[in-house]
């Protein structure tokens, strides 16, 4: 019989754990709580919390809401969200990850700093991602977002650059962008960069590579919207081509299980442990 192992290092990061704990605590008191966006990029966990009374809303719905209680998830929000909350008498339950909060403050300080320098504030991140929207909001929309090294080539190298990163991005790609800017920026201006990638996320890359390489077959469990999930799954795939992205046991092709001796189950920072355990049980029942 095949050995089935769940990666101990996979599962929620502390920022997501805090957000979910806050949601559960509020729901146990009131039974109803709004959440601005999905609390986590995992549909199964979202459904579990919805059954407890959590109501996900978008920004348009938030703007129309009055006299209510709203949870802000770990990704963080731009300043406009807090202004709307005060105007509409909305009580905020702020679950912004402390790592994201520190980054927001750094970017805001850089933006409001009066140093008479014509500089570009650049954020390496995914355009439209909730965290990135919150970061760009600290600069009243002036920050430049780049998603990959190729996009860094269109920066104005005659102006100073301050480079930051979305907390869940790839450290390798960030370092490539840093090296490219160093090589191309004018000697008359300044370049400062801040490695703001969360170490709890970055450290998972070498660990998940090791885990994936130690199994014949790997099921990476993640919601399709998870940026971190995409990065970690790609790392699994690099070391073990027999890695498969799933978000539930229903997506497992039973033919993959035939003749396999070792099966690994791992996931993103937005993947609940209970879901990986559920998938492990389903696999064991089929082999």
Protein language model features and the residues they cover:
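The feature marks the mature, well-folded catalytic cores of soluble enzymes
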Residues: 1-287
């Amino acid at each position: 019989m095949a050995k089935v192992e769940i990666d101990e290092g996979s599962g929620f990061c502390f920022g997501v754990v805090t957000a979910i704990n806050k949601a559960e605590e509020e729901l146990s008191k009131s039974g109803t709580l709004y959440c601005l966006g999905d609390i986590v990029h995992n549909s199964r966990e979202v459904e579990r919390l919805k059954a407890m009374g959590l109501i996900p809303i978008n920004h348009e719905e938030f703007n129309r809401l009055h006299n209510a209680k709203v949870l802000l998830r770990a990704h963080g929000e731009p300043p406009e969200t807090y202004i709307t909350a005060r105007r509409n008498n909305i009580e905020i339950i702020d679950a912004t990850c402390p790592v994201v909060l520190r980054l927001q403050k750094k970017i805001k300080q850089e933006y409001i700093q009066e140093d008479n320098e014509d500089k570009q504030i650049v954020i390496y991140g995914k355009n439209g991602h909730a965290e990135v929207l919150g970061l760009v909001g600290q600069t009243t929309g002036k920050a430049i977002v780049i998603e990959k090294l190729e996009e860094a080539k269109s920066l104005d190298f005659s102006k100073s650059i301050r480079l930051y990163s979305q907390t869940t991005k790839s450290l390798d790609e960030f370092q490539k962008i840093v090296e490219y800017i160093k090589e191309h920026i004018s000697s008359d201006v300044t370049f400062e960069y801040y490695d703001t990638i969360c170490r709890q996320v970055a450290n998972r890359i070498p660990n998940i590579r090791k885990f994936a390489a130690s199994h014949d077959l790997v099921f990476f469990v993640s919601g399709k919207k998870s940026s971190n999930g995409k990065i970690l799954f790609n790392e699994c795939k690099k070391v073990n081509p027999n890695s498969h992205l799933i978000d539930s046991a229903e997506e497992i092709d039973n033919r993959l299980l035939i003749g396999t001796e070792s099966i690994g189950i791992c996931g993103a920072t937005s993947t609940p442990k209970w879901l990986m355990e559920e998938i492990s049980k389903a696999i064991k029942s089929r082999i």
